[in-house]
Amino acid sequence: FLPMTQTIKRLLNEEYLGNPYHLNFRYNANYGRSPEYSWRFDQKRAGSGSLGDIGSHFIYLSVWFFGAVTHVSAELCTFIERPDLDPTGQPYVRADDFSIILLTFSNGAKGVVQATTVAHEPTPWGQTHYFDLHGSGGTLRGWTDWEQTYKLLGAKAEEKQFQEIEIPELIQEGQQLGDIQQMYKETFRKRGQMTGEFIEAVASGKTCSPTFEDGAEIQRILDAALLSSQEGRKVEINKIN
């Protein structure tokens, strides 16, 4: 997990928000703006487009922050006209390049996750991320453009303005947030917090997070979102096998 999301999780564990009300996460990317064929938007090859490719990350964070999801409503859209045939000359089903998902959590809180691959994001990585979390005790707000901004703000219910929240050195582990792209590379490539951590857990017989069970639960939410969009209705997670 990146330093910002680790810090948000710590603050939630310390009940910074009090009773959680709702969250709004936006994942803006631009890699889907090109009209050429791409396997990422081929339903058979990718499984889903923006929903599974990038929306899944923020859906997982939503569950990590606010707990289990009970119901899902979603709308998946395709804005970019792409070729009717894949490179082999076969027709294919075009996957979504934009998705918006409404989550209902078991504690009564709500969440909105928006994932788009067709946003114009004039930054080196072509992405921006936004996090808003609200509760009885206050608000947390974070965002990054993966170039110059990597910021987390907070305001308790009795405060009149936001304060920048420092990301502790314990979480940074020596990473320099001033160089945001280097921080990302160190987190996921040098420190082994993705594949390396998983391999170490298998070799040592220990448990790592996220688990396969976590992944299966997120897949159920994705399946519920696809069904909701197809049938135009709210879907209960327990009805998804």
Predicted regions and their residues:
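Terminal low-complexity tails and localization/encapsulation signals of metabolic enzymes
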Residues: R233-N241
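C-terminal hydrophobic helical "lid"/dimerization subdomain
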Residues: G215-S229
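C-terminal glycine/acidic-rich active-site capping loop/insertion
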Residues: D84-D86, Y92, I100, T104-F105, ...
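A general structural signal for well-ordered alpha-helical segments in protein cores
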Residues: M4-T5, F58-I59, R191, T195-G196, ...
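Glycine-rich phosphate/pyrophosphate-binding beta-alpha loops
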Residues: S56, A115-T123
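Glycine-rich beta-alpha junction loops
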Residues: F1, R26-Y31, L76-E81, N107-A109, ...
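Predominantly a Rossmann-like dinucleotide-binding segment in NAD(P)-dependent oxidoreductases
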Residues: F1-V93, G232
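Beta-strand scaffold of nucleotide-dependent catalytic cores
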Residues: P20-L23, V112-A115, W143
